[in-house]
Amino acid sequence: MFILIIKCGIMEKEVISSREFIDRFVECLEKGEDFKLKDCVVEGNVDILNIYEMIKDKELKGGYIEKKDDEIVVNINIKVDIYNVEFNGDFRFFVNMEYQIVISVFNGNAYFRVITFKGSVYFIRTIFNGDVDFIDTIFEENAYFSVTAFKGNIINFSGTIFNKESHFKSTTFEGNTYFSVTTFNIAEFYNSTFKSHVYFDDISFNLLSFTDCRFRDDVSFKKIDKENFKGLAIFLKTQFLNKHTTIENFQLSKTSFLKTDVREVLLCDVKKEEILSHKILRIKEDSGNKDKDLENKLKELLGLSYKYIIDQFNYKSVLAEYRNLRISIENNRTYIEASNLYKMEMELIKEFSNGRFEKFIIGAYGAISDYGESMEKTGKWILGSMILFTILASILRFKGMEWDIFKIIEFWWISFWEVIRLFLQIGTEDKSLWILEPIIRVTSLILLGNLYIAVRRKLSRK
């Protein structure tokens, strides 16, 4: 089979017009020959409407065009291989006319490798029936892949740079999908479905948003920190349907898993920090201790989606996120991190509690035992209270005595022993301690109860 190759220059790129690009593209379509373009600069807009206009009056023996009620489908029945090309205008393979839309269907493999798109790129409602490769490609303006179907075995965006917004709304990825070593500015995945393996390894971003998305097979996320990148990630109502899901180096202070079940997700490199959803909830509630810098960042990055996203946050949903995260971390046997999350979960409950008494009780629980997470802290409270009660008991029992060292030691020892008896709920026959007895008993119940919770929690995690 003869393959038409457009090769523009060897040492430096030659400039061609978008009209020449379209002429050669249509020529390949008519002849059924693969289209190759290499080492060129294309000036002007590339528009599927111009391709449609050139072939609509020709015989449709190749099945290039299908007309439906409200759309015109341009079938690209050839392989497309474009390498090291710079497009200086918009690249539109979707056009919305007054009464009809023009969409594209790539029936062969589509390779756009080492490309620079200087204008906006539109692959809206496009169908890729073969493999797709955008490796090492730069999108300098917005890129739209909404309502797009990637049906091939391989979808590769590795090494790609999205300098502005990238939209993947209601997009379907059927084959193995690679976004490895990819740089996003603002990436929005909304109502998208990933049916096979997905790799978001070594990525960097300002905002990465997954809303109402579904991952049916295993998926791995690994973020790398870059200077001047905010690294905010939002997983809202996202479904991870495979147990082999790994999320690495996504700091909880910059990541929200609101209404997302992560109980069986492996979260790596979790540090002690307040989760992003807790901070956003403060912004929504307009509390006095909200993070104003974060609020401004979210407004800037989310744009028109800001109100919709922010309205999803409420006390119960954020509390559920804390608990899901804690269960996930406990399942991965990283108990120290799980303990830290539980403390912050209790801080959330205290912060949004309505009653002063409830806030006091929760605060006391935290002060005594770190919400049942610290045996050491509770032990210090027990020791300190017993010393204090021994002093008070000695004062109540004092009726005068000889200043003999052994008598003094004996006196203090008896006081200490009486306090221990009361602390262990055994009781005392010393009537002089009747005032102190109920105080010691109540304190004992509180402190020993906290110690029991801390010990049980520690043993359950062994």
UniProtKB/Swiss-Prot annotation:
Keywords: Cell membrane, Membrane, Transmembrane, Transmembrane helix. GO terms for cellular component: plasma membrane. The chain crosses the membrane at residues 381-401, 433-453. It is found in: Cell membrane. It is a multi-pass membrane protein. The keyword NAD does not apply. Its main location: membrane. InterPro entries: 5peptide_repeat. It holds the Pfam family Pentapeptide_3. This is Uncharacterized protein MJ1147. It comes from Methanocaldococcus jannaschii (strain ATCC 43067 / DSM 2661 / JAL-1 / JCM 10045 / NBRC 100440).
